[in-house]
């Protein structure tokens, strides 16, 4: 059973699973080669940054790291995906792709369950 936890992204992510996986795979397949822990760090950093309105300072505090570390991790996401975190459309695509990964695709990359959204 899938919990939607009131999130439009969660609802969109699981509404048509096969279609969503096909749509977002090109966006995030560049992370598949990373270790589970390295991928989690990047995905968690992005999620916390988005949830805090793009504040590097707040994201750093919540992740127990310096804002420059958050900036570096976000830059790595931009480099890997070819998307810019200064463009709202790119941010939206990454949000959806990471939500689909968290809810539907994590099993194809590793065997650990996804970290629940905070």
Model-inferred region functions:
Residues 1-118:
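Cytosolic nucleotide-utilizing catalytic cores of signal-transduction proteins
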